[in-house]
Amino acid sequence: MSIESGPVQANTLPVDSHTGRPIPPRAQPGYYAGFDTLGQQSFWDAATREVVVRRVERVPPIQFFTEQEVTLLSAVMDRLIPQDDRDAEHRIPIVPQIDNRLFTGRMDGYRYDDMPPDGEAYRLGLQGIDAVARQMHDRAFTELEPEEQDPVLWTLHQDRPQGGDEIWRQVPTDRFWLLLMSDAVDAYYAHPYAWNEIGFGGPSYPRGYFRLEGGKPEPWEVEEQRYDWEPPPTSTSGEYKQLGGRHPHRAPAGQGGTH
């Protein structure tokens, strides 16, 4: 089973703050133009090099999710971690990595007592997302426009899903949301293309770090080249908002990200 990326719409692209025009998709979005982490692979040990290069050259086949679940989860990921600013050749394969984790049974080593196993949680959660979409818009999630999809996901973020009550009694909404987001972030930022985006020079072993003073790039890294941009007009993610739910969550540390 393959995953196809649809055409990019102008209203899903980040906007240049000065011109007001959409910023076209590029091979490497972010503030580190021209930086290529894989260019440092000769400094890594063989085992590390094999693991990292495989993330680019060998995308896992879909073996856990059904075709319908892949289509739905891909649409969800397109809103949680949009990649419209990347050209088609440099999209990071999030769904295949989640699928591979579930198929091979990898987990963190613990499970909340009110949560089903991760695979079951995903199947239920995806059904729940579609139920909320149909309750709010009388259509499947994949049939909605981006500006309609975000409010559906927002109800999960706030632990107030509008629809699918029976499903959410089996998988707590806030727990599922954290599972979904943590898997998405893990898959995205484990990929060398994401490292290029944030200027991360890759594994330090066996070379080690040289610039131990705070905020300074290593000799093989590049200086940050910031520019002004605004979130896409269809996005609701321009600022951090506290999670809803029964379980306490801390706000993340750090600066605002790239687009």
Model-inferred region functions:
Residues 1-40, 51-58, 68, 72-75, ...:
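Mature-region segments of soluble proteins
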